[in-house]
Amino acid sequence: MGILSERDRAAVTKELERLAGPVKLVVFSQELMAGDLCRQNEQLVREVASLTDKASVEVLNLAIDRERAQAYGVDQVPAIVVEGVRDYGIRFYGIPSGYEFANLIDAMLVASTGEPVLAAATRTTLATLAGDVDIKVFSTPT
C-alpha cells in the first residue's frame, strides 16, 4: 500500500507535469539510526518519482556513503537532496509530510528550471549580498 492516496497521486502527477527538466532525489538513510522514518521517507520519495519520467531516485546510506554525504553536507537521516542540472543546496531532513510535502514538490519544480521564482526587487536585493547565505527552515510535524 502506498503512502499517497489516489487523489493525492493525481494532484501530484498534475503538478509534476510542470517539471522543466530532470530532477534527482538523493535519499540518505541509515537503518540503525532511524529505520522506520528512513523507510517511510524512501517510500514517499519513490512514490513521488514514479509519477513522472523526469524524476529519478538514488538511495545512499549515511554511514557507508560517507564521502557522498560529506560532499552534500548531509549529516542526519532521513535526508533528501533535491538536484536539477546541478546541486542548488536544497535539503529536506525528516519526512516531508503534511504541509512540508508541498514544499518538496515546489523544490522539485524550482530545481528542474534552475531558476527560483522571485520578484525582480527580491533578485536585486539578493544580488547585493556579499556571499552565500545558509537559510534553514524548521517545522514541526502536522
Which stretches of residues belong to each language-model region?
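Thiol-based oxidoreductase modules, predominantly thioredoxin-like and allied folds used
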Residues: 53-65
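Structural micro-motif
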Residues: 22, 66-91
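N-terminal beta-loop-helix "entrance" segment that forms/cooperates
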Residues: 34-39, 65-71
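Non-catalytic, surface beta->alpha helical segment in thiol-disulfide oxidoreductase systems
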Residues: 81-116
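Long, charged amphipathic helices and adjacent flexible linkers at domain junctions
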Residues: 111-129
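Contiguous, structured surface segment used for ligand recognition
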Residues: 45, 69, 104
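Local sequence-structure signature of Cys/Sec-based thiol-disulfide redox active-site neighborhoods
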Residues: 7-52, 127-142
